[in-house]
Regions:
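Primarily recognizes the serine-hydrolase "nucleophile elbow" in alpha/beta-hydrolase
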Residues: 122-196, 216
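Short beta-strand/loop motif that positions the catalytic acidic residue
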Residues: 228, 233-236, 240
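N-terminal cap/lid segment of alpha/beta-hydrolase-fold proteins
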Residues: 21-50
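Short beta-strand element of the alpha/beta-hydrolase
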Residues: 52-61
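Cap/lid segment of the alpha/beta-hydrolase catalytic domain
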Residues: 64-72, 91-115, 192-201, 276-278
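C-terminal catalytic histidine-bearing segment of alpha/beta-hydrolase fold enzymes
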Residues: 42-44, 100-105, 235, 245-318
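Mobile cap/lid helix-loop segments that gate and shape the active-site cleft of serine hydrolases
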Residues: 31, 170, 186-224, 230
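Alpha/beta-hydrolase active-site loop
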Residues: 109-132, 287-290
Length: 318
């Protein structure tokens, strides 16, 4: 790497830091019956944020066993801030390293679904309820996920009508449906043997659940896209060696058949796990960032505003 490239990266880091206002992590389950003190939501609010500022809950990947909070968490949040978008990095529950190297969940429950979806629903609730505090638009709250986090992001839209918080006695006064979703090299299917990412399936379902046909089907997202699914942005690289791009093709097909507004971008090169990095992936795959901002401003948010306007008109007629 030459000196110019070093200087460019250094200046980029300084610029991103200047735009970002990282706040202390929030323990999202404090004061509730849920025992999950390690689940946190870290706000990154751009300087000068206004009430119209969109917000994105960021779900890092890691096969539902661990989380890449540096590249697919903090790095993404700081980049979003540089675009004037508020970000909230979610450290959701995962199976853990011991579940990866052993089979202890044959004997104890451990962490598995619906823990993860419960975490993201709670996060959407808290972000919307705290919109005034963070100077964000509560009607422009999306979820962005990478790899297994992409599965969680799409699941947050797919199962938004199911209140996973109700067993805890939590009745949100706001919607837990995201207004838009971005899925980067996502895990999608848990049933299609051609494309399934087995480690992620084991992470979210557990030792017994990974063999349960009904449970696997229930979280194969391509089979359960709802009619009211919000707009979706998808990116996958053809040379991804970790999660087959067939996952995104299945999702694209399902969204198309349901006539859900979405954009699916296929890159020839880029691999996996590049997040918003300036050095990982390829020059081609790094263009997803500009594509996402354009899609958000020109496609997703206008659709969100139109939907909100129609809902407000219905309320006025009542």
């Amino acid at each position: 790497m030459n000196v110019r490239k070093y200087l460019f990266i250094l200046l980029l880091i300084v610029a991103l830091t200047a735009h970002a206002q990282q706040q202390a992590p929030l323990k999202i389950w404090t004061g509730t019956a849920e025992r999950a003190s390690n689940v946190t939501l870290t706000p990154y609010i751009p300087k000068g944020a206004t009430a119209n500022c969109p917000a994105v809950i960021v779900c890092p990947g890691g096969s539902y066993h661990w989380l890449d909070t540096r590249i697919e968490g903090e790095g993404v949040a700081k980049w979003l801030n540089s675009q004037g978008i508020a970000a909230f990095v979610l450290r959701y529950r995962v199976a853990g390293v011991w579940a990866f190297i052993s089979h202890y969940r044959l004997f104890v429950r451990g962490r598995r679904q619906p823990d993860m979806l419960r975490d993201v629903q709670r996060s959407i609730q808290l972000v919307r309820e705290g919109a005034t505090t963070w100077s964000i638009n509560p009607q422009a709250v999306g979820v962005m996920g990478f790899s297994a986090g992409g599965h969680l992001a799409v699941a947050s839209a797919t199962y938004a009508s199911t209140n996973y918080l109700s067993p805890l006695g939590i009745v949100p006064k706001v919607s837990v449906r995201p207004d838009f979703v971005a899925a980067l090299y996502p895990v999608v299917t848990l049933t299609d043997k051609r494309y399934v990412h087995r480690r992620s399936r084991k992470g979210i379902l557990g030792e017994w659940g990974k063999c349960n046909k009904k449970l696997k089907d229930s979280l194969s997202l391509e089979r359960h896209i709802p009619a009211n699914c919000p707009p979706v942005f998808i990116v996958h690289c053809d040379d991804d060696p970790i999660v087959s791009p067939g996952n995104s093709r299945l999702l694209d097909s399902a969204l198309t058949s349901r006539r859900i507004p979405h954009q699916y971008i296929r890159y020839n090169t880029g691999g996996h796990g590049f997040g918003a990095s300036e050095v990982k992936g390829s020059a081609q795959s790094r263009r997803w960032r500009e594509a996402f901002v354009s899609w958000l401003n020109n496609s997703a948010l206008p659709l969100v505003r139109d939907t909100a306007d129609r809902q407000n008109k219905k309320i006025e007629k009542l």
